[in-house]
Amino acid sequence: MYKKDVIDHFGTQRAVAKALGISDAAVSQWKEVIPEKDAYRLEIVTAGALKYQENAYRQAA
């Protein structure tokens, strides 16, 4: 899941942080691909509007 898509969905970084119960600073430290645990939680919080994409977190062997 990409940080840009998440922020586009929620409108602001602060709204993302509030939805996850984390700090704005934590969200600001995300890279382009957000942490896997947060992606999974966001799929649940958004009732599937944002999708956890397992392949984004698997490295090629």
From Swiss-Prot:
GO-annotated molecular function: DNA binding
Keyword annotations of the record: DNA-binding, Early protein, Repressor, Transcription, Transcription regulation
DNA-binding region range list: 13-32
InterPro entries named in the record: Lambda_DNA-bd_dom_sf
Function, in words: Cro represses genes normally expressed in early phage development and is necessary for the late stage of lytic growth. It does this by binding to the OL and OR operators regions normally used by the repressor protein for lysogenic maintenance.
Protein's name according to its UniProt entry: Regulatory protein cro
Species whose genome carries this gene: Salmonella phage P22
